[in-house]
A protein has these predicted regions:
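Short beta-strand/turn micro-motifs at beta-sheet edges
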Residues: 24-28, 82-85, 184-187, 249-255
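Sec-exported extracytoplasmic/periplasmic mature domains
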Residues: 53, 57, 100, 112-116, ...
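Short, charged/polar, Gly/Pro-enriched secondary-structure boundary elements
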Residues: 75-80, 89, 157-160, 169, ...
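Core segments of cupin and vicinal oxygen chelate
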Residues: 30, 39-78, 198-246
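Short, surface-exposed linear segments at secondary-structure transitions and domain or protein termini
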Residues: 87-93, 172, 247-252, 339-341
Length: 349
């Protein structure tokens, strides 16, 4: 097998992690079919629910107590609105991976074999390199005897859930029973049909190798020297800034200045037209701005130029912020983080 210059360069910062990778034989232990969910921790669930339903017309796919799960496209992918606890800052607080033939007991063994530890009894969520198995009962939308769920924190402390590809946040052994879907109370001014990607600011150089080890992620595109790590066989990806390892673009110099965690999430839509989408957002009440500030309820476009893998004249990347100032990017459903006007040109590397 030939090794491209890009593949070799991207592997250099991860060399300290290689002994563990060599110890693993065969394919990665988990096969993810793609991104499955994003969780927003919000100051007011009712306000955020009204905002997102008014914008996208998303039905309620499931409820987990006071947490609301909004269906993305045809489902079972979802956007979760979780109420912030007292003193908790609103954030994009978690992501999810759909995993083929998912089994919690096997997954826990895999994590234990890689040095992860169970979170302390009574913990609300795991710390970095920990996991937690939560049993969700009927009062939180699970089964009467409990729906078991697995949450993991990567080396930088970023939280993600792994679950079966059929998971919808409902009841049943796999959390895949969502029979009480509620139609949106508002029509929506546009529609999103799929997940796209997450951009994560990390502070531990083992972060990217951690995901490569578990899922076998490989670059599907580069923005300058920063890889878009493909998730599944489609166009979903993760991108890391800060000191994540696995990329010469992430030396760690800027990690301390930015907040560690998920910077923004991206959703895909059909027939993306940045000018039309911007106008719909403005008509919906958002303020168009030239800069990339994160005040609540603004929208802006950033042009990714050829030096960062974009098109001649720039690949338009559109962002908006919600009532809590959380940033969501909108792109065409074919967007892969690559070149072309739609960012959908990702030739094999």
């Amino acid at each position: 097998m030939s090794v491209t210059r890009r593949t070799f360069i991207a592997s250099v910062p991860a060399l300290a992690y290689v002994p563990r990778l060599i110890a693993q034989t065969g394919a990665a232990p988990f096969r993810s079919t793609g991104l499955s969910q994003l969780t927003l921790t919000v100051s007011d669930v009712g306000k955020s629910l009204d905002f997102y339903q008014g914008l996208f017309g998303m039905p309620v796919q499931a409820r987990q107590g006071s947490t609301v799960l909004l269906r993305i496209g045809a489902g079972p992918k979802f956007l979760e609105l979780r109420p912030a606890a007292a003193g908790e800052r609103p954030s994009i607080s978690a992501l999810g991976f759909a995993v083929e033939k998912f089994d919690i007991d096997r997954a826990v063994k895999v994590l234990n074999d890689r040095g992860l530890m169970a979170a302390a009894a009574g913990a609300e969520k795991p710390a970095a390199m920990q996991y937690i198995v939560r049993t969700r009962k009927a009062d939180l939308g699970g089964s009467a005897d409990g729906t078991r769920e697995l949450f993991v924190a990567d080396p930088s402390g970023v939280l993600f859930q792994m679950h079966d590809v059929s998971y919808c946040g409902g009841s049943g052994a796999q959390g895949n029973t969502c029979r009480a879907v509620e139609a949106s109370k508002r029509k929506g001014v546009m529609a999103v049909t799929d997940m796209s990607h997450f951009t994560i600011n990390a502070n531990d150089p083992k972060t990217v190798p951690f995901y490569q080890d578990l899922f076998g992620f490989q670059p599907q595109a580069y923005q300058a020297a920063t890889p878009a790590w493909g998730v599944g066989a489609g166009v979903h990806f993760l991108m890391f800034t800060g000191n994540a390892g696995g990329s010469p673009a992430n030396p760690g110099g800027g990690a301390a200045a930015a907040r560690i965690g998920i910077d923004h999430a991206c959703l895909g839509m059909n027939d993306f037209d940045p000018a039309k989408v911007t106008q719909l957002l403005v008509d919906y009440g958002l303020k168009k701005q030239e800069g990339q500030g994160r005040d609540p309820l603004v929208t802006f476009i950033s042009l990714r130029m050829p030096n960062r893998g974009g098109a001649e004249g720039g690949t338009p990347e559109l962002y908006f912020t919600d009532p809590d100032g959380l940033a969501i990017q909108l792109q065409d459903v074919k967007y892969c983080g690559g070149g072309g006007f739609l960012g959908d040109v990702c030739p094999p590397l």
